[in-house]
């Protein structure tokens, strides 16, 4: 399965989960290494844009294409989540789900519903899982955001 990530070119190929360990994420707490990837290039763009300050145009960003094995993916069903799971301030239960996944190390990746686009998915990859050795970077290229996408 090919997944995508957009981020600062200086860190884009770091698959150790160091950024998530430092800052946490919607589905993981600070202190837990994890790698967030998206199911499409377009979703990767949206995941960056929703966090930008108005009028900020990111530069020095890259798009990373990553291949992960499909035989070690656990899926989170929307029906199992609290009603407010899409809220900007995500409920604590989401971090509990992700933290448990990362701690158990039973699967390489956790498929997560996107809070931005219905029927699209993000993935939380556990860099400490043994199958991480099978994860491959396929392509890295500079990425420029179209100025029309930036909040005015």
Where are these regions (language model features)?
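Extended catalytic/binding region for NAD+/ADP-ribose chemistry, centered on the ART fold
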Residues: 27-47, 51, 124-128
